[in-house]
UniProtKB/Swiss-Prot annotation:
InterPro entries: BPTI/Kunitz_domain, Kunitz_BPTI, Kunitz_BPTI_sf. It comes from Caenorhabditis elegans. The keyword Glycoprotein applies. Residues 21-74 form the BPTI/Kunitz inhibitor domain. Transmembrane segments: none annotated. SMART domains: KU. This is BPTI/Kunitz inhibitor domain-containing protein C02F12.5. Glycans are attached at N34. GO terms for molecular function: serine-type endopeptidase inhibitor activity. Disulfide bonds join C21-C74, C31-C57, C49-C70. Coiled coil: none annotated.
Length: 176
């Protein structure tokens, strides 16, 4: 019995998690049993978890109650990429690494980094540290503190009521 349990935990659970994480986002359907809520899904293009408005019934397998649940289930702790999940132009071993060619910047992971296009990386960093022209960026609480509520697309209706969604090149954010 112990062998069977171990076999399931080592092989079946990771396969099912990967299936869920790579599944298409399903918003569900409106129904009288449940009300709408904000849930999270793993975006396999940008390799990150983003919020969306769940309509109440019929959610897909790529749907999580919280950002933390999504990240724990789908994103390996050592996974990183260049901004917008664009391809790297080499590897590096420290910020400011001179091994990266001109026009690229070292983006560090755990032990090694990628040489990423500087222009794209700057755009990515700006988009993930949003500023509102009017009002404040909507934030949400994570285990380490407050952080901007950033979604993949305004069409996912993740912004709270009475806030405005601002769409960027890769992601979107909410102003209030």
């Amino acid at each position: 019995m112990l062998f069977f349990t171990l076999l399931i935990q080592l092989f079946l659970v990771p396969v099912l998690c990967q299936y869920a994480c790579s599944s298409e986002l399903k918003f569900g359907t409106a129904c009288s049993e449940n009300k709408t809520s904000t849930k999270w899904y793993y975006d396999s293009k940008l390799l990150f978890c983003y919020p969306y408005k769940y309509l109440g019934c019929g959610e897909g397998s790529n749907s999580f109650e919280s950002n933390e649940n999504c990240l724990e289930s789908c994103k390996p702790a050592d996974q990183f990429s260049c901004g917008g999940n664009t391809g790297p132009d080499g590897v590096c071993f420290a910020h400011g690494d001179q091994g990266c060619k001109k026009g690229t910047v070292c983006v560090m992971g755990g032990m090694v980094g990628f040489c990423c296009d500087k222009k794209i990386q700057d755009e990515w960093n700006k988009e993930n540290s949003p500023k509102c022209l009017k009002g404040q960026v909507v934030q949400f609480k994570q285990w380490f503190g407050m952080t901007p509520l950033i979604g993949r697309s305004c069409s996912h209706n993740f912004c709270p009521e009475k806030s405005t969604c601002v769409q960027g090149k890769w992601t979107a954010y909410c102003c209030q």
